[in-house]
């Protein structure tokens, strides 16, 4: 073991936290809990600057420490105040450890970073000896030995891992000496050299043996190279000392060249000797440039109402001639007679997919000049229907009059190659053939526009790998593809190839990589990324290889967050946003290494039975996504193929789940390690057409995975009307914005607006309202006076409807972001303001929500638009009601709440086209109007009330996710003992108060909607934590079933279904944004008495007060809490969406006065929110004048509280327990309003030790609440 020298650098101060996020800093300070606790972290807004964070009265105060031109450091001060400058950070902190230095409080208690076991563990699980990059010959040799170490018997493992041991010794000790030497000006690394020489002693002899053998073989084919080998061997025998390592590298380089060229030389020599021409094997699958005519056998779907058709032959064949631009509809008659009609591409008006019947398709034909007809056909399978749609879209695109495409197809492939070169035929991977959701044989003939290949453990050099891919594409598509980007990090590679015709449409190509390997310094794990613009649409692609090992979930999560933050791709002006918000479409794929948390034998049994649902429920990636730990709002197609890892090499029949390591036998359960996820801006078009794996490529222990996507793109818009005059200028105007951010800070905030449609980013003024109902959250608001009117560079609606606006909420004290989001302008266009509501995120974590009212004003001269190709296909919810089974994903990632005004109704055309009967005809005017408008809603602007039934809200109720741990008496979440023992479904069978004027027209909610909405595995085609309202959100409950209650102090998150079912009372649904959905401002109401909650015995863990329903059920104390794969309980690991939480902070139901008077009573079942016992936060809100109609926020009543007529002292005196007054007041319980939330632990902290006295006090409080 190498000894650590005396020159080791001193450890950093306890208060110094490099690379710590603002949110994590606030959590550390909250856990410390003492005034004067402090730490210093890197600034998120200024490179090279720091942020001093101080806790005082439960609020975190942040001070920026900025370097000046001379690299002196100073705390940023108010204008006119002379800053105090210091050479080093410790000197600066030393000053502020003294009292009265201008900070909010003296720095007293440095806070250390909590170091977990995984933080200290620098090994990489299974990969103790990572394969080295393939660029030099030495790395090839290392890769070979690495392969030996996994497959050789245990007695050879120690020798094989010699380099690993020496490397670890160097990283733990001697590298610090080299670092010190470099700081002192050294140009070499003696300790590293020594480490490498000792590691490579045996390699010298092995290389010499191989070279001697190759010398003999070389003499047969090439005398020149043989003599060079001889000279090299003689030279190497005389070398030693400092030059030894250099000559070893030279030998290895020659060995590499010799090995790669000897086969070619031998082949040439043998060909010269042979007089016959070698036979060339035919290509496996040559694709003609001309796509052949494809024929589909279908049946006509006859409506029962059309009795004249019943009994007649309804068999048809549909022939698609892509090259000729026509569709032949042939009806099969008796006696071999046929009747056909030919429709050119311009006569096919629309395709309408049925959601309820997956193999049904409606086709609307233009029959005559101004008439249309619809026919519904039943295909042999859903796959055949999709192939037909793809061919027709290709035909439309090919014969379109547009110069630029509206839609492209993208192939994404990911494969861990296992350090073995790929087999030559890669057809099944390229053609998306194999297991899972695959393309129909008729559709695989269609070449994709862009191919993106991500590989891991790829030992092939870049040039050779790109050539292999190009040749494979040429072989199977008969088209030339151009490589536009290749990025490599060790053995992690990404290659992007595009059709030659698209080469000039691609610009702004960017590439980047991030290392997350051992100690985050080695590139054996990490990510490579590529970004570019395709005309006006931005794309990002990330290929990653994350930490292996079944138990390394936290480290994989951290790998993802590091990549998200450090990968430098996309527009540099968007550096305030992580890469998940920088691109119209972001694809993230690779060997993510998330495993299955289940016994190996159970896993194998489920795989043998092809039952994947139980496995997907214990898939670590799905579980972590459900908890919002990673891939926030990303989507993944449904998995319907077996786990892709770990197979026996050479076949796909057997999983090899044991692996010999230096530390012993390791179990690798079969898992879906290789995945493809994506995230797109709201109101954009993207459809996943295939997602599966191959079953015939067997060189690696992983199977290659493929996914194909249909993606809408925009052109580089050029206005036909030229630049707008001042009278024709479009405007983006905000009426108001309100945000709830997760922070213990109480600074002021402003908003920055970014968009490609703006010349430069714009800033708002600071917020003019600010309040807090919870110490860990802040509600901030901006009125129209504080918000800037934005002027787009182009005013045409055709341009603006494809644009998006990025918002970031930043603090005035540190100019650091507290949350970012993206809004689509498409739904905001109109003469009246539209409302938006979406989530905020920062560094991959959900940090709150934001809502507001805005409009995009477009001058009438610029209103002309056209139908996009992808709008040509719509989705029909069918005449039977809602969709059944799995449905297509919603097109939006945020909710648009449409007011019930004439402005919204104008967007609904005439009757739905999907309702037109088979022979129904209508005028072309009506048809054109409807076609466009229906598609706008189906594809672009999904109603909260019409969204997919499978799109659910996460209701994970983990207080640790949305409160800062360690803050006493502040939690507002379910106690662990009322969490159900399975995944937590959201509220079911909810009811809401109807809007004014709708009494008697309401319909009861669907009783079966809850089952359709909740999926623990997140397997529907949607972002797992999507916050779009589901169908039953739009259902309006009966008038009498509405619960009328005043706004609580702190409304709790939604209760899980199990908690509701255990209650004796029947609760209605708390309507989400009822005031917004109804388009009305609720009438102001006076505060009403709100009964307190009955806390469960013992309160909530961590000193918090749990909330529950009155008359709580008796729960078994022995019931085990819900647990996930790492053994963490639900309270520790189940995460509540911050958006769900923030909604409850900002939403209340306001009943009308008559309803309130009729239904309120002291015995009515009600929920009460929590108030806080100590240091109540004063509201700083500035009154805002609201318009009488159309305003976003209603006049809110003040927080309700326990109605009291006496002080705490008087109350205690009545009970004869006045001696407890001093203890209660000392602990902040100075008002009966707060005492309603006190628990037994709180009473003990206040000095109430006697159990009988505690019982008297709690019973008295309960009685007063009633």
Curated annotation (Swiss-Prot):
Chemical reaction(s) catalysed: a 1,2-diacyl-sn-glycero-3-phospho-(1D-myo-inositol-3,4,5-trisphosphate) + H2O = a 1,2-diacyl-sn-glycero-3-phospho-(1D-myo-inositol-3,4-bisphosphate) + phosphate
Biased composition (Polar residues): 136-159
Protein EC: 3.1.3.86
Region described as Disordered: 114-159, 879-951, 986-1132, 1147-1174
Boundaries of every SAM domain copy: 1203-1266
Compositional bias of kind Low complexity: 994-1012
Motif (NPXY motif): 958-961
Modified positions (Phosphotyrosine) in chain numbering: 961
UniProt keyword list: Actin-binding, Cell adhesion, Cell projection, Cytoplasm, Cytoskeleton, Hydrolase, Immunity, Membrane, Nucleus, Phosphoprotein, SH2 domain
InterPro entries: Endo/exonu/phosph_ase_sf (IPR036691), IPPc (IPR000300), SAM (IPR001660), SAM/pointed_sf (IPR013761), SH2 (IPR000980), SH2_dom_sf (IPR036860)
Skewed-composition ranges (Basic and acidic residues): 114-123, 915-924, 931-944
Gene Ontology biological process terms, A to Z: BMP signaling pathway; cell adhesion; immune system process; negative regulation of fibroblast growth factor receptor signaling pathway; negative regulation of insulin-like growth factor receptor signaling pathway; negative regulation of neutrophil chemotaxis; phosphatidylinositol dephosphorylation; regulation of immune response
Matching PROSITE patterns: SAM_DOMAIN, SH2
UniProt superkingdom: Eukaryota
PTM comment text: Tyrosine phosphorylated by the members of the SRC family after exposure to a diverse array of extracellular stimuli.
Pfam families reported for this sequence: C2_SHIP1-2_2nd (PF24147), C2_SHIP1-2_first (PF24150), Exo_endo_phos2 (PF22669), SAM_1 (PF00536), SH2 (PF00017)
Membrane topology: Peripheral membrane protein
Record has Flavoprotein as a keyword: no
A GO-annotated cellular component: membrane
SH2 domain span: 15-111
Chain's role: Phosphatidylinositol (PtdIns) phosphatase that specifically hydrolyzes the 5-phosphate of phosphatidylinositol-3,4,5-trisphosphate (PtdIns(3,4,5)P3) to produce PtdIns(3,4)P2, thereby negatively regulating the PI3K (phosphoinositide 3-kinase) pathways. Plays a central role in regulation of PI3K-dependent insulin signaling, although the precise molecular mechanisms and signaling pathways remain unclear. Part of a signaling pathway that regulates actin cytoskeleton remodeling.
Family the UniProt entry places it in: Belongs to the inositol 1,4,5-trisphosphate 5-phosphatase family.
Free-text note on domains in this protein's UniProt record: The SH2 domain interacts with tyrosine phosphorylated forms of proteins. The NPXY sequence motif found in many tyrosine-phosphorylated proteins is required for the specific binding of the PID domain.
Protein name in UniProt: Phosphatidylinositol 3,4,5-trisphosphate 5-phosphatase 2A
The organism of origin for this protein: Danio rerio (Zebrafish)
